[in-house]
From Swiss-Prot:
Entry keywords, A to Z: Electron transport, Heme, Iron, Membrane, Metal-binding, Mitochondrion, Mitochondrion inner membrane, Quinone, Transit peptide, Transmembrane, Transmembrane helix, Transport, Tricarboxylic acid cycle
Gene Ontology molecular functions: heme binding; metal ion binding; ubiquinone binding
Record's GO cellular component terms: mitochondrial inner membrane; mitochondrion; respiratory chain complex II (succinate dehydrogenase)
Primary localization class, coarse: mitochondrion
Protein's recorded name: Succinate dehydrogenase [ubiquinone] cytochrome b small subunit, mitochondrial
UniProt: heme binding residues: C109
């Protein structure tokens, strides 16, 4: 006797075939790895020494702990009112406010990328590539700081740059609309 599809759940018959269930059960879990970076060989379970050795905690570093968290929150909270002020004003911000906004935004980006590198390119797994990533982050931040200096001294700053890009796109759109008429 053939039952309609909606009635199969009442009879206790399987709706899914066994092959489908096996396919779900046979998938292997794979940890996140970066395909183009070589990894260091790891001991099983990440245990150094023997399992009976006492745990040796890493040395405390407040810059990577509580101070890091406080600085991250200070950067985030200082950027929000400055970004709001920059959006609400019609002209460019003062040089001091724009410089402070740019440096705080750069500091916040630095700390967040630092956290990403620490989490996903760990020194234990990737070895020297962790240090290379940190050097590249520092170099990129220094170049960005120089770029902020050039924007502040030669133009209206970062906020002026964003506003000029926004205005130019509005002018381009209005010119396209007028050209269609």
């Amino acid at each position: 006797m053939m039952l309609p599809r909606s009635m199969k759940f009442m009879t206790g018959r399987r709706i899914f075939h066994t092959a489908t269930v096996r396919a779900f059960q046979s998938t292997a879990k794979k940890s996140l790895t970066i395909p183009f970076l070589p990894v260091l060989p790891q001991k099983p379970g990440g245990v150094r020494g023997t399992p009976n050795d006492a745990y040796v905690p890493p040395p405390e570093n407040k810059l990577e702990g509580s101070y890091h968290w406080y600085m991250e929150k200070i950067f985030a909270l200082s950027v929000v009112p400055l970004a709001t002020t920059a959006m609400l004003t019609t002209g460019p911000l003062s040089t001091a406010a724009d410089s402070f906004f740019s440096v705080m935004l750069l500091g916040y980006c630095y700390m967040e990328f630092n956290s990403c590198i620490t989490d996903y390119i760990s020194e234990r797994v990737y070895g020297v590539w962790h240090k290379y990533a940190m050097y590249m982050l520092g170099l990129g931040s220094a170049v960005s700081l120089f770029g902020i200096y050039k924007l502040e001294t030669e133009n209206d700053g970062v906020v002026g740059l964003v506003k000029s890009l926004w205005d130019s796109s509005e002018k381009d759109n209005s010119q396209k609309i007028e050209a269609k008429k």
